[in-house]
Each structure stands twice: as structure tokens, then as C-alpha cells.
């Protein structure tokens, strides 16, 4: 079995991680997750510190080659999973599925609002204007518009709420930036990916939106994993 082989003494983890030692509890958890996926049954796992739960659920999920949504309890964990754990594991396992990170829309820069705010810059507070100019410079460099990657201004900057994407200010297809909209592109990537990393707030928001029958943020995957479900 591929899952057991990955955790074995000469498996993918042992070859890639210096000083790797087999942890029986981690292997047992991975087996339980694998069985749950293949039998399409729900599974609840309580894992103590040091078990290595992230690898224990990701490896069987990735090796199933099914469409997966991993939902985390915080944006910090979401980013660690997407930028660190997931790339490392895919490299170890020799896999290359399409992966996507999706956050709530207020985490993305709105080019329309950015343009609007800069057009009224003459009457603006100097600190806010300075921050807006820094954000605008970053906007020309970012590929995803995720404000989590913005380091040029403080997280508490008063400029951020002014240029964050919001349902209330979105003008949809009438927007000059519609084709390059960061929020729209992030959602399209998520719909097209095999592995999607979200947080609980977004996952549940998608469920509410789907109940209206008008829209959806996420696909209906084969596997959903809640990390930090408590």
C-alpha cells in the first residue's frame, strides 16, 4: 500500500527528511484517513502534540488522487500548509496536482478601489496617502493580490480597509479591472484545482452561498479535511 510505504523506514519521508524515525501513531492515523477516504466514511481524529498529524492526513489524501479541500482554523495555519507543508510533501511524493489557496475576498486587493482612492488623494491624510502609494507600488509586482503578502505597510494601516475587496463595493463585469480582478482569479484557480486550501470561515460561507442557489466559491470535492476542527 502506497500510504504505508511512504511512512516506512526506506519510504519517501525517510529519504527526504534527515533523521526521520517511524512514529507508529502517525502511521496509524494515516491508515485511518486512507480507509476513511476509500470507504467514503466520516472520521474524527484527536492527535496529540508531536504526532505529525499534517503529514498523516495529507499523504493519504494526496495519494488518493481525488479532489481535496483542506480547511484550517486560522489564516496562519492556512499559509503554512500552502507555502511550506504542501510543497514539501508533493516534492517528496513526486506529485504535481494543481493546488490553490483561497481566502475571504477582503484579503485581496481591489484595483478599482485602489484607483478610486488615489484619484481623491489631494484631500487625504498624509500617512494614509503614503501607505496607499506603497500598496500601489506592491500592486504592480504581486501576482495574486493577497494582502497577506504585503509587508510595505503595517497590518493596522488605515489604508487597507479602503482598498480591500468587498461585496458591497464590487461592480462586477462593469469594472475596468474585471479580467484581472485578484478575487475573481483566486476563485477561478480554486474551482480548477485538485487540492484547495481554505479556512473554516470561508468553507462555511461557501455552504451558505450555495444554499441560495445563486453562486458558489468552492467546488464540491471528493474529500474534505478539517484541521483544528475544534
Q: Which residues make up each language-model segment?
A:
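SF2 helicase catalytic motif II
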Residues: 218-230
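Conserved helix/coil segment N-terminal to the catalytic DExD/H
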Residues: 184-191, 201-219
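Conserved P-loop NTPase motor core
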Residues: 55-60, 94, 98, 208, ...
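Walker A/P-loop
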Residues: 39-57
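Walker A/P-loop NTP-binding motif
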Residues: 34-35, 54-67, 84-88
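Conserved pre-motif I regulatory segment
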Residues: 2-44
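A substrate-engagement module of RecA-like helicase motors
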Residues: 2-16, 67-68, 72-196, 201
